[in-house]
Swiss-Prot record:
The keyword Transmembrane applies. Pfam families: Far-17a_AIG1. This is UPF0641 membrane protein PJ4664.05. The chain crosses the membrane at residues 10-30, 49-69, 81-101, 146-166, 190-210. InterPro entries: ADTRP_AIG1. Keywords: Endoplasmic reticulum, Membrane, Transmembrane, Transmembrane helix. GO terms for biological process: long-chain fatty acid catabolic process.
Length: 223
């Protein structure tokens, strides 16, 4: 059993190291190649749900990395809390981003953006965080513990908070970071946010259900 735990902790260390390095690179790319108008505006890049979720994912991976090194149960529990929030959130970011850009990329990325997004960056921020958090949750963490009611409240709260934040940024900047929001009326935007929160909640439920089937035998999750 101790051998299995040590191997699991080493594999977790590798995951968190790779993820941390990749996400730091992504933030560095954003800082050096970002849209100047967005960077100088109120809220900067944190107007984007992608960047907000990326920041929480990076934090969870850094905390996970330090927990792997130190063996601290406090850090493990903190990492799990962050992961429970961001794992379904990253999943919805990937679903929404790739489905929308496959239909019309200009709905999310302005046509006049000075620096086009290279594929490696696109994948690093819109796909790999989902991969990292799913692997971490399914193979190195205990299952989600919140019941249906509280978990639904959590994701509705996140959706409402982000909606209010985006509207605050619009009041200050007079433009939306995502072009799609400029063409949706208030009712359609409310529906959009509601659907997104329901999908996030659905991801939470599905991931909670499949977790027992993902963990390898003899490798107990760290809790």
């Amino acid at each position: 059993m101790s051998s299995a735990i040590s191997r699991s902790r080493f594999n977790s260390f590798i995951l968190h190291t790779v993820a941390t390095a990749n996400l730091i690179w992504a933030f560095n790319w954003i800082n050096h190649n970002s849209d100047v108008a967005i960077r100088r505006s109120y809220g900067s890049h944190f107007q984007h749900l992608t960047v907000l979720s990326l920041a929480v994912t990076l934090l969870s991976m850094v905390v996970g990395l330090f927990s792997d090194i130190s063996g601290s149960l406090t850090l493990v529990k903190l990492k799990n809390i962050l992961l429970y929030i961001v794992c379904p959130l990253e999943t919805i970011v990937s679903i929404l981003y790739w489905s929308i850009v496959s239909y019309d990329r200009s709905l999310l990325i302005p046509k006049d953006r000075p620096v086009p997004l290279p594929l490696n960056f696109d994948i690093s921020v819109h796909l790999m965080p989902t991969v990292y958090t799913l692997i971490d949750y399914l193979f190195f963490s205990p299952p989600f513990s919140l019941s249906i009611g509280p978990s639904l409240l959590v994701y509705l709260s996140i959706a409402v908070s982000y909606m209010l934040w985006v509207e605050k940024c619009y009041q200050m900047n007079k433009f939306y970071a995502y072009p799609i929001l400029a063409i949706l009326d208030p009712i359609k935007k409310t529906i959009f946010y509601t659907v997104a929160s329901i999908i996030s909640f659905s991801c939470y439920i599905v991931l909670k259900m499949v977790h027992p089937y993902a963990l390898p035998s003899g490798a107990p999750p760290r809790s």
